[in-house]
Amino acid sequence: MFQIGDNIVYPMHGAGIIEAIEEKELSGKKQLYYVIKMSISNMQVMIPTGKILSSNIRPVIDILALTHIIQIFQHGESDELLPWKQRHKVNTDKIKTGEIQKGAEVIRDLIRMKKEKALNTSEKKLLDDAYKFLVSELELIKGITEKQIKSFC
């Protein structure tokens, strides 16, 4: 499915690059693993090739898909106001999907809320994490400049 050198997004971890595909033996069973270098933390993650679909890992979007995300970010409607506990769960679930659109919605909605009132500690952390995940993916989009990333975020 993925090749060495592919830029990917791993939900709740951000973007990374597949550095290798290695065979490892664990409990007497040999398996192929994707070796992924994560952009945010510089950590290395190994995921069995057979579990790649269930992990929701996806390729980094291209610059054309980014224009749609920008529209959602700038002009999309915010979700209805929920009690903070429900809102936190909804936002966390959106980020866990790994979809850039959902992550952008979380950032947009929390930034809009922040303009009206202070965010609580868990919402601040969620906003910070979602922002880091988004920027880590934007940095790997081919054809995008640092100036464009800064203007988007």
Task: Give the location of each predicted region.
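Charge/polar-rich, low-complexity and marginally structured segments
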Residues: 50-153
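A positional/architectural concept
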Residues: 1-55
